[in-house]
Design a protein with these regions (language model features):
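N-terminal low-structure segments adjacent to metalloprotease catalytic domains
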Residues: 1-101
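Auxiliary, metal-adjacent structural segments of Zn-dependent hydrolase domains
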Residues: 83-144, 208-215
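Hydrophobic (often cysteine-bearing) scaffold residues that line and stabilize catalytic clefts
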Residues: 106, 160, 194, 198
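Flexible internal linker/loop segments at domain or repeat junctions
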Residues: 146-148, 174-183
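Short pre-active-site segment immediately N-terminal to the catalytic Zn-binding motif
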Residues: 148-163
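Active-site recognition of the HExxH zinc-binding catalytic motif
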Residues: 161-177
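Pan-zinc metallopeptidase signature
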Residues: 222-275
Length: 275
């Protein structure tokens, strides 16, 4: 269906003569897979429990002896992941090929549209965004080297959503650095507000044009975001309204952040007052 389509023409942008990176899916090495699971097993804080997702992915790691040391748990993880990795090695290879074929049809048009939307070009020296494919419970991203990881068995719609979501973060933070160079690098990650805000804005950005014309998925952030309320209104609804305004992207980013900062700090103040 997509072979004869040119998304750049469909959404009204030009993709010629522009330096754009390419997402290249690659098979995760066994050691890389082991390292991700070692991290994920002990990650039990933040907006979601990565540990719980890890147990679902590797049920053999559930109910380990509580007397085991971290090094002993690492050894169990190495054995479990090695066994499963070798069992699914051929599928990891075939899924890597499938992911590359599917995303290639969207790569240039999406990255061009994202650059146009955020009013910032991709870094000139960024030729490739590496996406490693393995047996993992979540899709970690690595801002400093423009890469992310993904598991096998992801359907077409979800694959496109993950690619769009993770790479949005890469260019989003390039724009954030341009607007707010004073923000420390550590605040780009959990649990800081700048990070939380970056995860919230994927909904109002990707669910609107031009991206909603390009993709058929419905972008959704963490469930906890949709439970936040500001008086009688949903915070996410108000954030969507901000991003629907006919104002510059810089104004949207700043107004949205100031709003989220006010609401979340107000919520903290109210909890303190009740103590």
């Amino acid at each position: 269906m997509l072979e004869n389509m040119n998304w750049c023409d469909i959404i009204g942008i030009g993709c010629d003569n522009m330096a754009l990176p390419k997402i290249m899916f690659k098979e995760m090495t066994l050691q890389e897979n082991i390292d991700v699971i070692k991290w994920a097993y002990f990650e039990n804080n933040g907006a979601l429990s990565v540990h719980d997702f890890t147990i679902k992915c590797f049920p053999q790691l559930a109910n380990l002896d509580t007397n085991l040391s971290r090094d002993e748990i690492y050894k169990v993880i190495e054995e479990v992941v090695t066994n499963d990795y070798n069992k699914h090695k051929h599928r990891i290879k075939s899924e890597t090929e499938r992911y590359n074929t599917l995303w290639e049809q969207y790569n240039d048009s999406y990255f061009k549209a994202l650059s146009s939307y955020l009013k910032i070009e991709w870094p000139n020296n960024l030729k490739e965004i590496s996406a490693t494919v393995g047996l993992i419970p979540v899709c970690p991203r690595y801002l400093d080297n423009f890469s992310f990881s993904i598991t096998i068995g992801v359907d077409d719609s979800k694959l496109l959503e993950v690619c769009a979501h993770e790479t949005l973060h890469f260019l989003w933070f390039e724009k954030w650095k341009q607007i707010h160079p004073e923000t420390p690098r550590r605040e780009y990650d959990s649990p800081y507000l700048v990070w939380q805000y970056s995860e919230m804005v994927t909904d109002p950005i990707l669910n609107n044009k031009p991206f909603s014309t390009m993709f058929e998925f419905d972008e959704r952030g963490y469930d906890s975001f949709y439970e936040l309320e500001d008086d009688s209104s949903k915070v996410m609804d108000k954030l969507r309204n901000i991003y629907s305004k006919d104002i510059s992207i810089e104004e949207k980013m700043n107004e949205g952040f100031n709003y989220i900062n006010r609401v979340l700090n107000k919520d903290k103040d109210e909890r303190i007052a009740k103590k």
